[in-house]
UniProtKB/Swiss-Prot annotation:
Membrane-related topology note: Single-pass membrane protein
Gene name as annotated: epsL
Entry EC no(s): 2.-.-.-
Keyword annotations: Cell membrane, Exopolysaccharide synthesis, Membrane, Transferase, Transmembrane, Transmembrane helix
Species per Swiss-Prot/TrEMBL record: Bacillus subtilis (strain 168)
Protein name: Uncharacterized sugar transferase EpsL
Induction comment: Repressed by SinR.
MF term (GO), any: phosphotransferase activity, for other substituted phosphate groups
Superkingdom of the source species: Bacteria
One Pfam family linked to the record: Bac_transf
Amino acid sequence: MILKRLFDLTAAIFLLCCTSVIILFTIAVVRLKIGSPVFFKQVRPGLHGKPFTLYKFRTMTDERDSKGNLLPDEVRLTKTGRLIRKLSIDELPQLLNVLKGDLSLVGPRPLLMDYLPLYTEKQARRHEVKPGITGWAQINGRNAISWEKKFELDVWYVDNWSFFLDLKILCLTVRKVLVSEGIQQTNHVTAERFTGSGDVSS
């Protein structure tokens, strides 16, 4: 895993340099069109479920109803935010998470802390490796496949990891981003919540 960490650091620095103009432009656009804060921050489970703060570009407003409840995602997602998501630009701040060691470039996506007690024993194995910006599930359906299938693919990655597999995933990710494939579930602007799929791990 030392090779994986060295590659993550080198690639993250390189990608931050290459995308610096895009990042700065996006910061300006988000601040102008959506407002502050520019970054969306949320606590997610990392390696072995240890919490860390995930960074993304903000794509939604904080509009609320008369009772103070957030409006549905499809209402709060702006046209600017939709474009940022389509181009996967919202994920670029996660390169900072890679530098910090919270994320790897490749690994199971970090989901919500609320999901931890809902996993089966097998599904929980996805946390045996560091989470990533992209992963085996992302190039095999992303948000267009079921939660159970995603977790199955995540565990397959854990059991079959190799440096060359990571390179393959990164190359295929570039193609997926270019064609904007599988970004959202049908009729959902964000992934539908996971509510469990059987006997959970103790």
